[in-house]
C-alpha cells in the first residue's frame, strides 16, 4: 500500500483529495495547522492526522519517515490574504519550502508533488496557455510559486522525482469551503 504524506491536507483541495486517495486504498498522513478546525476529515483506518506547522523543521524531520510520496498543498492561497501579512505569506509560501524538500529528499520519499498555480504565467494574450510559455508572475503569491518551482527542479533526480502541477483557480464544494472564489460565492448565493 502506497503511503502518502500531504502537507496542507486539511485545506480546500486536501480535504477533497484525501477521501479520494483513501477510497483508492492509499495510506495517508495529513499534516496541517488545522486553523479551520480539526473535524474536516472523517476518521478512516488508513488516515493519520498530525497537527503541525510546516515551518517547524525539527517536527518534520521526526515525522517524515517511511512515506513513498509527498503532496505539497500548504500555502496562503489568495492574493488578498497574502497581502494582509506579507511576512507570514513569505514564511509559509517560500521560506519553509526548500527545508521541507531537503527533509523529504533525505528520507525514504521518492516522489514530491507540488501544487503551484497557473497564476505563474501572468496575463497572456494567447487563447491557450501551455507550460512552454514564459512565466511572468504578477503578485507575491505567484512570484513565490515560481521560486518554489525553481527550488524543486534543482532536487529532481532518478531517486527523487519531482512533479509540479499548475492548476487554474480551483472551485467547487469542499469540506473546507472557500468563499473568496467568485464561482463559489455565486453558487452559495444561488443555493441558499
Where in the sequence are the language-model features?
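N-terminal Rossmann/SDR dinucleotide-binding element
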Residues: 1-69
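SDR active-site strand-loop-helix element
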Residues: 7, 31, 70-73, 112-117, ...
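Conserved catalytic-core motifs of eukaryotic protein kinase domains, centered on the activation segment
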Residues: 40-42, 80-87, 123-127, 175-176
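NAD(P)H-binding glycine-rich loop region in Rossmannoid oxidoreductase-like domains
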Residues: 54-92
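Glycine-rich NAD(P)-binding loop of the Rossmann-fold in SDR/ketoreductase-type enzymes
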Residues: 55, 88-99, 135, 139, ...
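Conserved Rossmann-fold NAD(P)-dependent oxidoreductase catalytic core, especially the SDR/UDP-sugar
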Residues: 72, 98-139
Amino acid at each position: 500500500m502506497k503511503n502518502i504524506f500531504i502537507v496542507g491536507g486539511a485545506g480546500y483541495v486536501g480535504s477533497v483529495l484525501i477521501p479520494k486517495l483513501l477510497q483508492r486504498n492509499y495510506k495517508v498522513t495529513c499534516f496541517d495547522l488545522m486553523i479551520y478546525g480539526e473535524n474536516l476529515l472523517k476518521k478512516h483506518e488508513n488516515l493519520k492526522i498530525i497537527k503541525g506547522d510546516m515551518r517547524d523543521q525539527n517536527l518534520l524531520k521526526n515525522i517524515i519517515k517511511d512515506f513513498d510520496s509527498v503532496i505539497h498543498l500548504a500555502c496562503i492561497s489568495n492574493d488578498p490574504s497574502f497581502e494582509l501579512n506579507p511576512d507570514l505569506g513569505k514564511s509559509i509560501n517560500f521560506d519553509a519550502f526548500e527545508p521541507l524538500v531537503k527533509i523529504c529528499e533525505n528520507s525514504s520519499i521518492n516522489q514530491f508533488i507540488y501544487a503551484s498555480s497557473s497564476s505563474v504565467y501572468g496575463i497572456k494574450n494567447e487563447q491557450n496557455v501551455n507550460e512552454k510559455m514564459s512565466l511572468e508572475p504578477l503578485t507575491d503569491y505567484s512570484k513565490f510559486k515560481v521560486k518554489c518551482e525553481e527550488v524543486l527542479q534543482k532536487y529532481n533526480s532518478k531517486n527523487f522525482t519531482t512533479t509540479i502541477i499548475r492548476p487554474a483557480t480551483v472551485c467547487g464544494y469542499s469540506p473546507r469551503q472557500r468563499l473568496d472564489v467568485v464561482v463559489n460565492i455565486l453558487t452559495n448565493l444561488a443555493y441558499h
